[in-house]
Amino acid sequence: MILRIAIAIFSAVLLLACTDSAPTEHEVSIAYLKSLCSGNHYRIVDDYIIRGVVVATDWLGETNKSAVVVDESGGLEFAIDSRDISRRLPVYSRISIFCNGLMLSRVGGKIELGAPPTGDFPLGSINDEMFDRYIRIEGVEENFTAPTKLFSEISIGDIGNILRFDNLHIAEADGEVRWCDTLDGEVVTTYRTLIDKENNTLPLRTLSTCDYALERMPENEISAIGIIDYADDRYFLRIVNKMIIQ
């Protein structure tokens, strides 16, 4: 009898210890996480986890020290400063981001994720020393397909997400126009204009750091896959992974 009581007490203590020490983690959607940032910034203090597919990094210079992760609810850009981002965070890898301790901030009209700021910029970067604490590679998404939309169907929920657009022409393309202009011998970030089959337009933004900045733009009809951004009261597209389909 005494032995049974002792075993019961030991089991209860062990269960209590496990309950107290094990953190409660909650998997949430990207859309839910972004909804927490109702102001200019939000410090995450709960054990939220988001899981998704990496669809863009700065490996081709198309983004600036950032990556984009998407799930079925939408997309989220997060600030990352790594010496070898293409190795540590391959495109189309499936990842988990452990968000407790990170920060959501409104940057240029959209919500981004990153580390708490250390300077004047509203968001810090997840650096190599922080990487393993916050990001875990779960595998590879071998059959990722970006959703297809028309320009007229873009909505606020698409900001940060990857989308595909078909039957496009580039308004400025004449066989000689490059993705980026030069000014005083320096390549500069440039906006062009995409036109779809309904004759609607969408600005296309290409960073000066892009690997193909000085390549000629296609004159013929294309499909383009990129990230929807928002700034200055307008949507625009950033092509990722050089996904220009002719």
Spans of features found by a protein language model:
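Sec-dependent bacterial lipoprotein signal peptides
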Residues: 1-16
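OB-fold nucleic-acid-binding modules
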Residues: 18-246
